Amino acid sequence: GYIDTSIQLSDKYRPWYSSRFANIEEVADYWMKNYNTLKEKTELFTDAFYATTLPAEVVEAVAANLTILKSPTIFRQYDGRMWNWEGCGNEYGSCYGSCTHVWNYAQAIPHLFPKMERTLRETEFFVSQAKNGHQAFRSALPIRPIRHNFHAAADGQLGGIMKVYRDWHIYGNDEWLKLIYSYVQNSLDYCINTWDPKRKGVIEEPHHNTYDIEFWGPSGMINSYYTGALQAFVAMGEHLEKDMTEYRELLDKSIDYMENQLYDGEYFIQNIRWKELQASDPTKVQSVNSNYSKEGLDLLEKEGPKYQYGKGCLSDGVVGAWLSLVCGLDEAIDRKKILSHLLSVHKYNLKRNLRKHVNPQRSTFALGDEGGLLLCSWPKGGKLQLPFVYSNEVWTGIEYQVASHLMFEGEVEKGLDIVRTCRDRYDGRVRNPFNEYEC
């Protein structure tokens, strides 16, 4: 029932309200008849929200960003299923398809409107997933099966498995878990067969991700997602009394590799690897930017494929461990090492003033006398000549992710420090407090 076979390629999107109201007069009539109830519910939420004891900067940040739910970034088609842009302009949407790795960072909807959030999982696993487990990380609108002619996104697909665990816990319905379980297993098996074919517990084959490139070789960022996905799947499978021996062995290997091969003593890094893999030469594989000039070929031999981060300190270098926490999973990776990574990010990547920071990318996100959390830095040297393309930028989504993770680990003041730095940029004088744009 999740694939509407009546939808044709030529069909246009029909919004949810069109299934409830024939015209604006019916909307107005409903509003008038239910005004008192709607007002009471609105005031109840508002009063409860602002009764919080959270610090003012956190309340402001959450309140401002919750308004996105009432913007054209969020669509809901006629049957109630949700579909989202990454953001929106005055007359257009920005980056279509409820992008799985982008929406990993959004945690409001599953707690405010859990039924709507579950429709995202149902689209990802029932509609946008092929029989071999490949998941298209951008879904079609109207929601319908989509062509599978590009990479799956490792962070989006693995993150989706953790979010199934979260949504099941919020819902509390085992029947929903039983319905989606085989699709989740198919998805995870695809991830293993495609990116960890040697069953090392490591994502090492080239894998697409939120930076719009492919990482080659294991990284703290993606392997933390892998660890979390395995942990979530083992927990769901054991609840359903399945034999999880194979997946638990992979989970143990994944944790061991994270802690002993990707941790440099201070933070988690990437081991760039492009030889002795199942994937072909980096110049030949499908990629957004796979063209190599003569200079690029020289760099390939010297540093490896373009657009990696190597020995850098990546701000979301343990983002999978953060997602595990917010999804309700226990900490699997050594907490002291995770905290050390986060403290390193705060130490090296948080800049109070960006006037001397060179950013050849999208510099308007944060510039001049503003502060911000850089996506990556190389405090110990080893910066690649062609690092991943957004490395010098500042993204609010990652600022909040790192800040909240620091708070989870007990470093509340350092987390608030990042939040304040972010919100200082969006104080209404130069930037719109309701528009922390990234795309």
Predicted regions and their residues:
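Short amphipathic alpha-helical coiled-coil/interface segments
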Residues: 31, 35, 39-42, 46, ...
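Hydrophobic alpha-helical bundle architecture
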Residues: 169-184, 385-389, 393-397, 403-412, ...
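Acidic/polar, glycine-enriched structural segments that form the non-catalytic walls/loops
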Residues: 1-99, 103, 116-117, 174, ...
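Aromatic-rich carbohydrate-recognition surfaces in CAZymes
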Residues: 24-38, 81, 92-206, 213-238, ...
